[in-house]
């Protein structure tokens, strides 16, 4: 497989075989934040309702292309109702910018007049409007994840906090889906692998045994003191016993702290970081699976998929982005 296709996302997706991809990781063009100078682009619709409707149509084809246990990961930011003065237009500066609240020298989230009933300064709520629209179309909205940007751009606005996050939504096609949580375990905060301390003499005949953590629950008188200490069920380092919990890991949390990454040339100024794509791909696929990105942009999704032994299909309407993305993906000789 391993291809980047230049063309309209909806048109190209309709040519893909059904159930050919295990996972889709993508960041669609944001609403009224960019003009990329390409006819037919998504994001410049007159209203946000039309914008969302187009994305729902695209993701319906993504759903068809996913395996029954496949997942969809969508990164998207918000925008404000207002004058539209912050928008990036082609060709002056739009080539370099994608992420809504990290636009290089512009410094503020772009604003738009595209909702007739909302006065200026209204946050449009685009991420959640899209999430609910996809849910209404049949997707299972499994989780919202916060991408907290450690290097967000400062903003000149004085009557609200500086925007430093975007959303990542996890959708599933079916109730049972592939999700390898072990692949993205994170370090446990404050983990200490030393034996848990306790007062000597508190456990009768077991007072000389080292207390290291043991089962979280017991079901009553079935356990003797000996069994209690040697129980091998789920461990808790807040308990006592003779079995040691030494993993030092925990399940990934739903706030992801990571910096944006920048690149020059024709690629996006603030593409989403490799680590973001890594987490989605590693837990959403197995080696050899096909990863899809219908708005491939700078090629981060495809590049990460290739690095971890996955196949990829990337789609973008802009020929310059397609060429740049292909150039950044190394040839996999294995």
Show where each model-derived region lies.
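A short glycine-rich, Lys/Arg-flanked "PGG" loop and its adjoining helix->strand segment in the class I
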Residues: 51-68
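Class I S-adenosyl-L-methionine
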Residues: 5, 11-26, 30, 34-42, ...
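Extreme N-terminal starter segment of soluble prokaryotic enzymes
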Residues: 1-3
């Amino acid at each position: 497989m391993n291809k980047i296709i230049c063309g309209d996302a909806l048109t190209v997706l309709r040519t893909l075989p059904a159930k050919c991809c295990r996972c889709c990781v993508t960041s669609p063009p944001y609403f009224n934040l960019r003009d990329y100078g390409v006819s037919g682009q998504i994001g410049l619709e007159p209203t946000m309702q039309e914008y969302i409707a187009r994305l729902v149509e695209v993701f319906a084809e993504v759903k068809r292309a996913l395996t029954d246990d496949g997942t969809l990961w969508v990164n998207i930011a918000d925008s404000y109702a207002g004058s539209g003065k912050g928008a990036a237009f082609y060709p002056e500066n739009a080539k370099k910018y994608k992420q809504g609240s990290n636009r290089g020298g512009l410094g503020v989230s772009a604003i738009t007049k595209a909702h007739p009933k909302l006065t200026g300064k209204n946050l449009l709520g685009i991420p959640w409007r899209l999430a609910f629209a996809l849910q209404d179309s049949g997707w299972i909205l499994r989780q919202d994840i916060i991408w907290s940007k450690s290097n967000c751009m400062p903003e000149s606005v004085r009557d609200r906090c500086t925007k430093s996050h975007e959303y990542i939504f996890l959708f599933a096609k079916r109730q049972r889906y592939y999700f390898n949580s072990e692949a993205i375990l994170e370090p446990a905060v404050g983990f200490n692998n030393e034996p848990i301390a306790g007062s000597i003499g508190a456990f009768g005949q077991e007072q000389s045994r080292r207390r290291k953590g043991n089962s979280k629950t017991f079901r009553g008188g079935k356990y003797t003191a000996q069994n209690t200490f040697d129980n091998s069920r789920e461990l808790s380092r807040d308990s006592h016993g003779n079995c040691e919990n030494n993993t030092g890991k925990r399940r990934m949390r739903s706030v992801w702290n990571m910096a944006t990454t920048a690149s020059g040339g024709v690629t996006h100024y603030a593409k989403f970081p490799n680590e973001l794509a890594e987490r989605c791909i590693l837990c959403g696929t197995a080696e050899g699976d096909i990863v899809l990105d219908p708005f491939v942009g700078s090629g981060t999704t495809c590049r990460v998929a290739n690095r971890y032994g996955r196949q990829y299909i990337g789609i973008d309407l802009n020929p310059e982005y397609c060429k740049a993305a292909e150039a950044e993906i190394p040839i996999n000789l294995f």
